[in-house]
């Protein structure tokens, strides 16, 4: 009878004892979590590196000018003056449309200068030169582009055209843009037939060359006896624009 009682108790214990799980391996939950975390980290790394790649490989000229120009523009000879004649500060910008550092200056400072011009705080004399004329094949793109920029003033498209010349800047050593291509840019901005005739005639070439020689020989625009573009001058003297706050400093000095 005692054996029967023991057998009965054993059957009851087996009936209520928990059965081992057959679909879960000890520690598998922790492993699944590690896999999920690893995948998430990998995705984040891919996104970060993709963002860095896009930023580092963005062309300088791809930036668009966010501030719309509302200032007046006039031309005197081969100098384009942007802004109100009564503005308290005058800045002179010497540039070459083939010069990559000029393109960088334009990209970095276009919005700040445009805002100051719109508000009447400054006027800017733009001197488009041809010091890099020999850097295209055939030579002459710097002159052709400088002439086209002058043609853009009476056509009423100078601010936008000036920006486009840098946004579509050809590489040194290339053929550069042709007169037909420069005319097409102006036409896309609303210029009429007179603009095309002005660009193709290249009538300011000699004056641009003379202005380049005069600027290059001006000791107030040189550093260690050398002239280059871009050169930025206030009161006729070259200033350092490597500081990102240079414009605010100039405006504050009045």
Describe each model-derived feature in a short phrase:
Residues 85, 117-119, 223-226:
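Extracellular/periplasmic catalytic domains that process cell-envelope and extracellular macromolecules
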Residues 99, 166, 170, 191-194, ...:
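A broad detector of the eukaryotic-type serine/threonine protein kinase catalytic domain
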Residues 90-93:
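Short, well-ordered beta-strand elements
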Residues 2-39, 43, 48-49, 55-56, ...:
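C-terminal cap of thioredoxin/glutaredoxin-like
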Residues 76-80, 110-111, 218-219:
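A generic local structural motif
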Residues 97, 103-181:
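Structural alpha/beta surface segment adjacent to cysteine/selenocysteine redox centers
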Residues 58-73:
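Ser/Thr/Pro/Gly-rich low-complexity linker/stalk segments immediately outside membranes or between
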Residues 72-88:
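A short beta-strand-turn-helix
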């Amino acid at each position: 009878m005692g054996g029967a009682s023991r057998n009965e108790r054993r059957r009851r214990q087996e009936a209520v004892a928990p059965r081992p799980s057959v679909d879960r391996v000890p520690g598998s939950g922790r492993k699944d979590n590690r896999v999920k975390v690893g995948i998430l980290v990998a995705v984040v790394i891919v996104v970060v590196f993709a963002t860095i790649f896009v930023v580092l490989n963005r062309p300088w000229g791809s930036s668009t000018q966010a501030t719309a120009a509302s200032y007046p523009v006039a031309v005197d000879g081969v100098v384009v003056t942007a802004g109100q004649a009564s503005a308290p500060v005058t800045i002179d910008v010497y540039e070459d449309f083939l010069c990559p550092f000029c393109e960088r200056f334009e990209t970095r400072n276009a919005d700040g200068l445009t805002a100051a011009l719109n508000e009447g705080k400054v006027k800017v004399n733009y001197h488009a030169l041809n010091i890099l004329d020999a850097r295209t094949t055939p030579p002459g793109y710097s002159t052709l582009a400088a002439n086209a920029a002058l043609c853009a003033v009476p056509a009423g498209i100078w601010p936008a055209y000036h920006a486009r010349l840098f946004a579509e800047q050809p590489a040194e050593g290339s053929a550069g843009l042709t007169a037909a291509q420069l005319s097409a840019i102006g036409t896309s901005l609303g210029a009429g037939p007179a603009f095309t005739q002005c660009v193709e005639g290249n009538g300011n070439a000699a004056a641009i060359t003379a202005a380049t020689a005069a600027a290059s020989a001006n000791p107030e625009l040189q550093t260690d006896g050398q002239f280059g573009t871009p050169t930025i001058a206030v009161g006729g003297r070259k200033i350092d624009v490597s500081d990102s706050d240079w414009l605010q400093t100039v405006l504050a000095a009045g």
